[in-house]
Amino acid sequence: MIQERVLITGAAGFLGSHLCDRFVKEGYKVIGLDNFLTGNPDNIAHLFGNPNFEFIQHDVTNYIYVEGPLRYILHFASPASPIDYLRLPIQTLKVGSLGTHKVLGLAKAKNARVLIASTSEVYGDPLEHPQYEGYWGNVNPIGIRGVYDEAKRFMEAMTMAYHRYHEVETRIIRIFNTYGPRMRLDDGRALPAFVGQALRGEDISVFGDGSQTRSFCYVDDLVEGIYRLLLSDYSDPVNIGNPDEISILDFAKEIISLTGTSSKIVYKELPQDDPKVRQPDISLAKKLLGWEPKISRSEGLKITVDFFIKQVNGVQKV
């Protein structure tokens, strides 16, 4: 039996590295691709030397050459946190456009099925709640967050064009807020920001009045959803996330309680176009994939905080 080969872009990132682990575990030959713009080599260091893992350092916006057959391609390369895409706005747009074009071209050439990592940010600051796949969104295309939102919307449009015009097998996942080990403490999103401040004994910064909501999905649950979607026969976008919604203020209080810190909450100005609500409607994922999250927020947070404590104490563990 010939071992099937999988290419994962953004392999050294938070999500990409967990996907590498999953596909190696499932018996695939995994080719990880990353240029380390925001990815961390430590996330995949444990895979080096594994005969079922190969790494290519490469910018996905340039021509991608992979020798031999590919069964699947998972496109997860992109700056994904506000700090990164505000620092790297043009690169963010390029990876969503040029990078996606290169990936889809490779999928066409290899006759490979490709899964594209989109995001709940395609819904922008939503006027419908919770958000379901048929909602077209409320996005400011020229706002500071627009570089990420529109890159992902373009990515979806190009993916569907390749599916319809070139008959490429495509899958699109819309990922909602996800957390777990290998997140960067400095990536600017609520969870690592709150945990980092708490562990350093600093006050926790809540933007606005903290009434805005998010829904946090543990990374293992997300990876299971990605795996099931890839193997499904469905080509339109599918939401994968945890519908357990919480306000940012209550979330900050949870982090304070979990870390046992004496940190106080301080309020800061809400950034432009920051979504007021975010909650996935996962009816489609339940129906199509038999998927729903299994890991509670309390369980997932404990694992994640333990990971961050080791990082702060200078012990790298992946």
Indicate where each model-derived feature is located.
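N-terminal Rossmann-like NAD(P)+-binding domain of SDR-like oxidoreductases, especially those catalyzing
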Residues: M1-T178, D220, I295, I303, ...
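C-terminal substrate-binding subdomain of Rossmann-fold SDR/epimerase-dehydratase oxidoreductases
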Residues: G10, L19, H58, N177, ...
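Short alpha-helix within the catalytic core of nucleotide-sugar-dependent glycosyltransferases
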Residues: L37, D42, L191-P192, V223, ...
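Short, conserved catalytic or interaction motifs in soluble domains
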Residues: T38, P181, N242
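Residue-level signature of the cytosolic catalytic core of signaling kinases
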Residues: G49, G143, M183-D187, D244, ...
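Nucleotide-sugar-dependent glycosyltransferase donor-binding/catalytic pocket residues
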Residues: S78, L93, M183-D187, S215
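A glycine/serine/threonine-rich, flexible loop-to-helix segment
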Residues: H129-P130, L185-A193
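A generic structural signal for short coil/turn motifs at secondary-structure boundaries
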Residues: P181-R184, P275
